[in-house]
């Protein structure tokens, strides 16, 4: 449970960071 929550949180942050990077590039 704890690991799943941590991984999903990290994935969310990574996804948002990737979207932000793409927006700044475009």
Swiss-Prot record:
Its main subcellular localisation, reduced to a broad class, is secreted
> Which Gene Ontology cellular component annotation is one that this UniProt entry carries?
extracellular region
A GO BP entry: defense response to bacterium
Annotated keywords:
Amidation, Amphibian defense peptide, Antibiotic, Antimicrobial, Secreted
Tissue range of expression? Expressed by the skin glands.
What subcellular locations does the record give? Secreted
Q: Which residues are annotated as modified residue Valine amide in the UniProt record?
A: 26
**Keyword Secreted found:** yes
Alphabetized InterPro entries for the sequence: Dermaseptin_dom (IPR022731)
Protein purpose: Has antimicrobial activity.
- Membership in a protein family: Belongs to the frog skin active peptide (FSAP) family. Dermaseptin subfamily.
Q: What is this protein called?
A: Dermaseptin-J2
């Amino acid at each position: 449970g704890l690991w799943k929550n941590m991984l999903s949180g990290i994935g969310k942050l990574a996804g948002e960071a990737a979207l932000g990077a793409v927006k700044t590039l475009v």
